[in-house]
Amino acid sequence: MDYQTTNSEPFYSAGQKQQHCWEPGEKAEYKRLRAQLGSSWAYYEYEELITCTNRLGYRSTTVVPPTVGDYFIMCGCSNVFGQYLHEWHRASNRVEKATGVPVINLGICGGGANIIAMNMQKLWFSNYPKPRAIIVQWPSIHRMAFPSEDVECRLIHIDIARENSGGVQETHASEYLLRHEGVYENQAHHAFHMVNSLEVPVINFAILSYIAEFYDIPRVRFVSAQDDRARDNLHCGRLMNKQIYKHIMKELNTV
C-alpha cells in the first residue's frame, strides 16, 4: 500500500477536494442565531459563504511548496482553516496580500498539535523547498488527529468534545487517555518542540489563555465586539483575524 508517509505529497491528506456553502446542520443554527442576535449581527443579511478545499483537503489555494521563491506555512485548527468565515477575512490571506508571499494554509478542523508536527516532519523528509517561516496557532492540548488510508475519513480524531457529541463512541479514546496523567501534555510538548527545532523561524501564538500559558507563547486576544465571531458565533471572526494578522506581521519584521 502507498502509505502517506512514502507518497509524493508534502503533507498528509486532511480530506477531499470539495466545495460547499453550509456546514452540516448549520442552516437551522443560522436561523436561530439570526433571530437571537438581531439586525446588528454581522451575518444578519445572508451573504454566500463558499468553502473550497484542495485535493489534500486544506482550504488553501497554494497546495504544494512553490519551486521558485519564498512561501510561508500557517498551521492550526478550524480558526486557521477559517471555518464559518469568508476566505479573504482570514489572517493567512491578509498576510499573503500584504507580503506578496504565498501562504500555504494547513488549518485542520479538529486538528491537534500532533498533526501539525507530523505535517512538518513529512515536509522536512521530502524534497520540497522549505518555508521562509512557519506560523502556528497552537490548538487545544486535549486533542489529537491521525492520518488514515480511508478515502472517506482521511483523519481520525481523538477529541473529548467530539466523543461527547457522538463521535468515536466505540472507543471512548479521549476518556481513556485522560485517565493516564501527562499523555496529552507530553505529546503536545513534543509536537511544539519538534516544530520549533526545524531551523526556520516559527511564529507561535495561541487564542486561549491556558494554551498560551502551557506553551509559554503569546496570546492573541478576542476583540470585544459582536463582529469578532464567525457565522457560527463561536470561531474567530473578522476583527480577531485582523488581530492575528497584526501579530504575525509584527513578528515577521523581526525574523
Question: Where in the sequence are the language-model features?
Answer:
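Short, well-structured alpha-helical segments in soluble
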Residues: 118-130
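A structural signal for short, well-ordered beta-strand segments and their strand-loop junctions
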Residues: 102-107, 133-137, 201-207
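Well-ordered, non-membrane alpha-helical segments in soluble/globular domains
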Residues: 117-121, 180-195
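Serine-esterase "nucleophile elbow" of acetyl-processing enzymes
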Residues: 53-119
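A structural motif corresponding to the C-terminal end of an alpha-helix
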Residues: 98-100, 186-205, 210-213
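Surface-exposed cleft-lining segments at the edges of enzyme active sites
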Residues: 78-83, 108-109, 168-187, 229-233
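Histidine-centered active-site loop/cap adjacent to the catalytic His
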Residues: 228-255
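N-terminal secretory targeting modules
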Residues: 1-73, 129-132, 138-180, 206-216, ...
